[in-house]
Amino acid sequence: MTCTIVVGGQWGDEGKGKIISYLCKKDNPSIIARGGVGPNAGHTVEVDGEKYGIRMVPTGFPNVNAKLAVGAGVLTDPEVLLKEIQMLEKFNVGERMLVDYRCGIIEETHKELDKSNEHLSKEIGSTGTGCGPANVDRAMRTLKQGKDIESISKYMGDVSKAVNEALEAGDNVLIEGTQGSLLSLFYGSYPYVTSKDTNAASFAADVGVGPTKIDEVVAVFKSYPTRVGEGPFPTEMSVEEAESLGVVEYGTVTGRRRRVGYFDHELAKKVCRLNGATQIAITCLDKYDTECYGITEYEKLSEKGKAFIKEVEEKVGVKVTLISTGPELGQTIDVRK
């Protein structure tokens, strides 16, 4: 029995979707539970060459044997949830979906307010998905809950009960975090942050799991960090430099171009300390050095690639156990014992 939490180590867009999908296939958890803010964070999962952009359904959906759960702490947009369930019909997502009846519900008014608020949309760079305004209503105790919405009633249940019973039965459980630690309302670059905490302890609380039940915390870092929206970015490079390196990306939810920077070891160390990370996953090593593309054995990495991994381990103080060398699940180096 292992309960693992996957967290983003930067400003989101670290490639958590790929790492989560890999862990779900390799470790075969019986439940994949999603924590985090809500549909403001997008994950891209590639299965057999086909890409799926999702915001509500857990990214471990390719594991067709696992139950998929959305915790009570996660804001839910019924429209987005139902569209994704339909889009992923061939993975039998609808039959495996469990949404906590206590989850907060995003309504159209929340999205309208998010988009029309100049401070949120222009100064902060909100995604406009209604999460901030919905969390305001939640704090005021006026927000609707999942149990109040007829259109998603068939998916309602007690996620905390299901997850804890799975752990008691000796099953593996994976908890998905969203966004990134540096976007935390408490520990990020305030006010350029999201509307709640985005660290491991909060993700555990989102799905109703106590801290003593957590065995592993995997912090995911991209070889070159990216950020969408406003806010400090200490190692940011120019657009021209990013283009010369072939690093041009756009946000899954917003479609906005991502800002690009160099790996920041000090920030990574801070994030690992904050989350109690037990291991690190590095993604896009093939973008840092194209010679690493598709490599599946550590010994076969280029010297440049190995040096990057070694420097991360030495300066951050946490073992790198997973290395992504391409978009496909099989393009992964796994050095876990």
From Swiss-Prot:
**Catalytic activity reported:** IMP + L-aspartate + GTP = N(6)-(1,2-dicarboxyethyl)-AMP + GDP + phosphate + 2 H(+)
Q: Which residues form the active site?
A: D13, H43
The terms describing its cellular component in GO are: cytoplasm
Q: Pfam families per the record?
A: Adenylsucc_synt (PF00709)
What PROSITE patterns does this protein's entry cite?
A: ADENYLOSUCCIN_SYN_1
Q: What keywords are assigned to this protein?
A: Cytoplasm, GTP-binding, Ligase, Magnesium, Metal-binding, Nucleotide-binding, Purine biosynthesis
Indicate whether Magnesium appears among the record's keywords.
yes
What cofactor does this one take? Answer: Mg(2+)
Instruction: Kindly state what the record says about how the cofactor is bound.
Output: Binds 1 Mg(2+) ion per subunit.
According to UniProt, this protein's pathway is: Purine metabolism; AMP biosynthesis via de novo pathway; AMP from IMP: step 1/2
Instruction: Note whether Transmembrane helix occurs among the keywords.
Output: no
Instruction: List ligand-binding residues for Mg(2+).
Output: D13, G42
EC number(s) on file = 6.3.4.4
Where do the annotations place substrate binding? T252, V253, T254, G255, R256, R257, R258
Q: Name one GO biological process term.
A: 'de novo' AMP biosynthetic process
Gene Ontology MF term list: adenylosuccinate synthase activity; GTP binding; magnesium ion binding
Q: SUPFAM superfamilies from the xrefs?
A: P-loop containing nucleoside triphosphate hydrolases (SSF52540)
**HAMAP family referenced in this protein's UniProt entry, alphabetically:** Adenylosucc_synth (MF_00011)
Record family assignment: Belongs to the adenylosuccinate synthetase family.
The protein's assembly and partners = Homodimer.
Functionally, this protein is described as follows:
Plays an important role in the de novo pathway of purine nucleotide biosynthesis. Catalyzes the first committed step in the biosynthesis of AMP from IMP.
This chain's protein is named Adenylosuccinate synthetase
Taxonomic source organism: Methanococcus maripaludis (strain C6 / ATCC BAA-1332)
Give the lineage: Archaea, Methanobacteriati, Methanobacteriota, Methanomada group, Methanococci
